[in-house]
Amino acid sequence: MKKLILSLLCSVAINIYGQERIILLNEGNWQADNGKMSYFEDGKVVSNQWFRDVNKRKLGDTPNDIIQINKNLIAITINWSNIIQFISPDGKRVAETEDVPNNRKLATDGRYVYVPIAYGSRITAPKNALDKATN
């Protein structure tokens, strides 16, 4: 049996205090639970396992998309884990959703996160995440 290896890279660039920062998302191998985030600051690699370094846990299985909702909140689709992970720009976990099947892409209007799934949906970032992000 052949093992199918898929790799997809998505990134978000953020500018904080005059520094150019890039967060690169790597989906890893399907069903291997090895998705990662790399973090670059001013053109230099800081970490290739940034989420794990900051949060002391894995990101999840097959992350697909990353989007900055506002200056204080970033959302990440973790497709095979069926979650949307919310982090702050410094990489700390803020909140996550549960049971969001087939989540692959994200869109935002700065307040809501829109996720196309099999049944169509609009997911509001968890209240505590938005409260932290707007204060």
Walk through the language-model features, giving the residues of each.
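Conserved beta-strand positions in repeat-built beta-propeller and related beta-rich domains
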Residues: I22-D33, Q68-I69, I74-W80, Y114-Y119
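Mid-chain, structured segments of secreted extracytoplasmic proteins
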Residues: L59-G91
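A charged, solvent-exposed segment within the mature domains of Sec-exported extracytoplasmic proteins
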Residues: R104-N135
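Repeated scaffold domains used in trafficking and secretory/extracellular systems
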Residues: K58-I67, P101-R111
